[in-house]
C-alpha cells in the first residue's frame, strides 16, 4: 500500500490446486460366509407384490428392469433380479399380489457359503483454492479462502458365491451366483475459510478460524450384472441351466445435495523469543449439521433425522 497514513500494509493473492485424496484401490477376499447373497434379494423382495418385481409377458429383461426402476425404484429392481434369476421364489407364483418369498439357494457347507469378493475403485477428490490475505497495522493479519471442490469416483464390485450342492427332492436349486455392481459418482462443491491472527504482545498470539460447510451437488450412476447356475430337478432328469441377467441399463439418479459440518477453531501461542513457543488449538465441529437435500426425499428425511442426533465434536 503506497498511502503513507494507511494501516493496510500488505496484500497477497494466490491460486492453488490440491488433490486431497486418491481413491485408486483394488483387493480380493475369499472365504466362508454365514450369510448368502440370497438374503440380499430376499430383504428387498419381502412385502413387494409379485407384479411389481416381474416382467410382463413378452417384455425383455432390459425393458422390465428399466420400467420397474422408473416406476417403483431401486428396491424393486433388486427384487426383480432375484426373482428373474430364480434366486428367490414367490410362495404363490400364480398370485400377482403375492408378497412373500423364499430362497432357492441350498446352504450345505455347514451353515456357510463360499464367496470370492473383488473390489476395484479409481478417482480423486480435488480442490482449487483462491486466497487473499491482508496485514493491518503491525499486529493483525486477515485471510480468506474460496475453495472449489471436485469429486470423480468409480467403483466396481463382483461377488462370486458357490455351494455346488443340490437339495433333496424335486425343485430348483441355485448353486452359483455372480453379482456385479458398478457405481460412478461426480460431484462439485464450494466452501470458504476465514481467519485472523492477532499479535497481542511480543509474547502472545491469538488466532480464530472459521471453516464453512462444504455445499456439494452429487450425481450418481449405477449398473448391475447377474449370472447364476441352477439345477432344475424333476422325477426324470436334472437340468443344469446357466443364466445371465444383463439389463444393459445405467441408472441415473436425481442429483442430490449434501452439506458437511462447519468448524470453528481458536488458537493461541506463547513465543519465547528465539528459545521456542508453546501453542494450543481448540475446535468445535457440529456433525449434527450435516444435511442431505432435497429435504422432502423420504430416504433423506430418515438420514437427516439420524444425523441430527450426532454429538458436537470438541477437540
At which residue positions do the language-model features occur?
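Outer-membrane beta-barrel porins/channels
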Residues: 3-314
Amino acid at each position: 500500500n503506497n498511502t503513507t497514513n494507511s494501516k493496510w500494509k500488505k496484500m497477497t493473492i494466490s491460486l492453488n490446486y490440491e488433490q486431497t485424496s486418491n481413491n485408486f484401490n483394488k483387493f480380493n477376499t475369499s472365504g466362508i460366509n454365514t450369510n448368502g447373497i440370497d438374503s440380499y434379494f430376499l430383504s428387498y423382495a419381502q412385502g413387494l407384490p409379485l407384479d411389481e418385481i416381474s416382467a410382463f409377458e413378452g417384455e425383455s429383461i432390459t425393458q422390465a428392469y428399466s420400467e420397474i426402476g422408473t416406476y417403483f425404484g431401486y428396491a424393486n429392481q433388486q427384487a426383480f433380479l432375484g426373482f428373474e434369476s430364480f434366486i428367490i421364489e414367490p410362495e404363490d407364483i400364480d398370485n400377482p399380489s403375492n408378497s412373500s418369498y423364499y430362497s432357492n439357494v441350498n446352504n450345505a457347507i455347514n451353515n456357510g457359503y463360499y464367496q470370492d469378493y473383488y473390489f476395484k475403485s479409481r478417482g480423486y477428490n480435488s480442490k482449487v483454492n483462491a486466497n487473499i490475505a491482508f496485514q493491518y497495522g503491525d499486529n493483525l493479519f486477515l485471510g480468506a479462502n474460496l475453495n472449489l471442490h471436485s469429486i470423480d469416483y468409480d467403483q466396481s464390485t463382483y461377488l462370486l458365491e458357490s455351494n455346488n450342492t443340490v437339495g433333496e427332492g424335486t425343485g430348483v436349486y441355485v448353486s452359483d451366483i455372480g453379482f456385479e455392481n458398478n457405481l460412478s459418482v461426480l460431484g462439485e462443491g464450494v466452501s470458504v475459510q476465514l481467519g485472523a491472527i492477532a499479535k497481542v504482545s511480543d509474547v502472545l498470539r491469538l488466532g480464530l478460524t472459521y471453516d464453512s460447510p462444504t455445499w456439494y451437488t452429487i450425481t450418481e450412476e449405477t449398473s448391475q450384472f447377474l449370472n447364476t447356475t441352477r439345477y432344475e430337478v424333476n422325477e426324470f432328469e436334472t437340468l443344469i441351466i446357466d443364466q445371465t441377467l444383463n439389463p444393459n441399463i445405467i441408472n441415473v439418479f436425481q442429483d442430490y445435495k449434501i452439506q458437511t459440518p462447519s468448524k470453528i477453531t481458536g488458537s493461541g501461542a506463547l513465543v519465547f523469543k528465539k528459545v521456542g513457543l508453546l501453542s494450543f488449538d481448540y475446535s468445535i465441529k457440529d456433525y449434527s449439521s450435516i444435511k442431505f437435500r432435497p429435504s422432502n426425499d423420504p430416504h433423506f428425511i430418515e438420514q437427516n433425522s439420524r444425523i441430527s442426533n450426532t454429538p458436537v465434536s470438541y477437540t
